[in-house]
Curated annotation (Swiss-Prot):
GO terms for biological process: trans-translation. It is found in: Cytoplasm. This is SsrA-binding protein. Keywords: Cytoplasm, RNA-binding. It comes from Ligilactobacillus salivarius (strain UCC118) (Lactobacillus salivarius). The lineage of its organism: Bacteria, Bacillati, Bacillota, Bacilli, Lactobacillales. Signal peptide: none annotated.
Amino acid sequence: MAKSKPKDNALAQNRKARHDYNILETYEAGIALTGTEIKSVRASRINLKDGFAQVKNGEVWLMNVHISLYDQGNIFNHDPLRNRKLLLHKKEIKHLSEETQKKGITIVPLKVYIKNGFAKVLIGIAQGKHVYDKRETIKRRDQEREIRRTLKNYG
């Protein structure tokens, strides 16, 4: 029996980031969460749309990522928009810091998932696209789709 593809276990994805940015490199980082935050993340109640990461004092912080309040959290609930620390190796942090010093480069979260019981976030070093670049991408995607469609019908 053929092996099946491993399913994508993403709890949240930032699809808009791949449209708005050219992703140059990606890193897998752990994320420091409180008890009610991890319960909300496991329930897929997280929004990465406006999120970004910054390097401050040798640490990487994830900002503007909304993790909804946990329903049974009562007084122990967390602040939905608090800054969260990303867990990376020093070498990776140094590289991220050097890259973000360049003009037009930022760090964006691409995906949040659970791996071996721990929450992980896939972050990408990204460079902003211009409007004409976005149109080129859409045009190229449509052409490839049209080619696949004709090959399927006549091939």
